[in-house]
Every structure is written in structure tokens, then in C-alpha cells.
Swiss-Prot record:
It comes from Burkholderia pseudomallei (strain 668). This is 3-demethoxyubiquinol 3-hydroxylase. Its EC number is 1.14.99.60. Its main location: membrane. Keywords: Cell membrane, Iron, Membrane, Metal-binding, Monooxygenase, Oxidoreductase, Ubiquinone biosynthesis. Its cofactor is Fe cation. Fe cation 1 binds at E57, E87, H90, E171. It is a peripheral membrane protein. One of its GO terms (cellular component) is plasma membrane. Binds 2 iron ions per subunit. Fe cation 2 binds at E87, E139, E171, H174. It catalyses: a 5-methoxy-2-methyl-3-(all-trans-polyprenyl)benzene-1,4-diol + AH2 + O2 = a 3-demethylubiquinol + A + H2O.
């Protein structure tokens, strides 16, 4: 059973890095009028932001995989799996949007994935309450990060905006689930370290 689980997660990891994701929900579409034409500068900026979001979803897959593998609770395994499936939708959506913008995912995705997997294992080994607290804090920081992107995206890029808005709604839900399941609040130094690591990732992934 454990071996089968490892094989499944290994396959998911390879697909995350390679950009071959399974979409269980369709790409969110803007409710309003047809998308407007973006200038070259707007397309470049939108692509940079969506590349950052794609990297975030690569990391989310690694984190949830690690947390799922390190918990002995069947209920938490199911919760992490459900969140990972929704995050895989995000991965597929952002990859789809990058292609529409004639851009590409980060060249450093294997590095981001490996780092997030290691962090997830450490969080999981510290116990379920810490692991859930880490999940809740991660989702809070992602929510804030997506709020920033919603204000930065070109006004005409309603397609990217629709994707980010649905991603944000899902992240809020995941964070609440982690808190409701018993996640503790992480100490301030840990939260600050997470923000610093996120800053390095986002500033690098925008370009690479």
C-alpha cells in the first residue's frame, strides 16, 4: 500500500515538473465581454505573473504530497489529496494561460519542486498540528500574493484575472480547512522565514 502510494505521488511529481497536469475543472472564463487585445508589454507582464503563479502550484503539489506521505491520519491524507487535486487544476490553468500568452513555465521548476518537497517533509515530521498550521499559513500568504496579482494584472487581461480569482477562492477554502482540522498558528520567525523564501521564489520566477 505504501509502495503504491509512493509510485502515485512520484508520478504526480513528474507530471508537475513536466507541466503535464490533469484538469478536473475547466479553465475559469471571464463572465463579462470578450477579452481585449493586450499590448506586448502587457502580455509580457501578465506572463511573468502567471509564471509565478504556476511555480506556486508546482510547489503546492510538492508540499501536499510530502504532507500526505508523512501523516498517519487517514482523514488528513484525504484532506491533503483533495487540496492537491484542486491545486492540480490551478497548475493546469496557469500552464494553459502561459501558452495563450506565448510564454513558458519557469526553467527552475525542478528546483522549486525539490525545495518545497523537502520543506513539506520537515513540516510533516513535526506533527499533524504543525503540518496543518504550515498549510494554513502557506494559504494565507498565497491569498495575499494573489490579491497583489489581481491589482497588478493589466485591466484588459480578464482571462488571467478569472483564473486568479478562482485560485484565490480555492486557497481561502484550503486555509480554512487546515485551521478547522486543528492547525496551530506558527511562530512569527517561521512566518517571516516563509515570506522571505516566497519573495526569492516570486522575484526569480517572474523572469526565469
Amino acid at each position: 500500500m505504501v509502495f503504491d502510494e509512493l509510485i502515485t505521488e512520484f508520478d504526480r511529481g513528474l507530471r508537475s515538473i513536466a507541466g503535464v497536469s490533469r484538469m478536473s475543472r475547466p479553465v475559469p472564463k471571464p463572465a463579462a465581454a470578450a477579452p481585449a487585445e493586450l499590448s506586448a508589454a502587457e502580455r509580457k507582464h501578465a506572463a511573468g505573473l502567471m509564471r509565478v503563479n504556476h511555480v506556486g502550484e508546482v510547489c503546492a503539489q510538492a508540499l501536499y504530497q510530502a504532507q500526505k506521505l508523512t501523516t498517519s491520519s487517514a482523514g488528513l491524507k484525504e484532506m491533503f489529496e483533495h487540496a492537491a487535486r484542486e491545486e492540480e487544476d490551478h497548475l493546469a490553468w496557469t500552464a494553459h494561460r502561459l501558452k495563450d500568452l506565448d510564454s513558458r513555465p519557469s526553467l527552475l521548476n525542478p528546483l522549486w519542486y525539490a525545495g518545497a518537497l523537502a520543506i513539506g517533509v520537515v513540516a510533516g515530521r513535526l506533527g499533524d498540528k504543525v503540518s496543518l498550521g504550515f498549510m494554513a499559513e502557506t494559504e494565507r500568504q498565497v491569498e495575499s500574493h494573489l490579491d497583489g496579482h489581481l491589482s497588478e494584472l493589466p485591466a484588459a487581461d480578464v482571462e488571467s484575472r478569472a483564473i486568479v480569482e478562482q485560485m484565490r477562492a480555492d486557497e481561502v477554502k484550503h486555509g480554512k480547512s487546515a485551521t478547522d482540522a486543528g492547525g496551530i498558528e506558527l511562530p512569527m520567525p517561521a512566518r517571516m522565514l516563509m515570506r522571505a523564501a516566497s519573495k526569492v521564489m516570486t522575484s526569480t520566477a517572474y523572469y526565469l
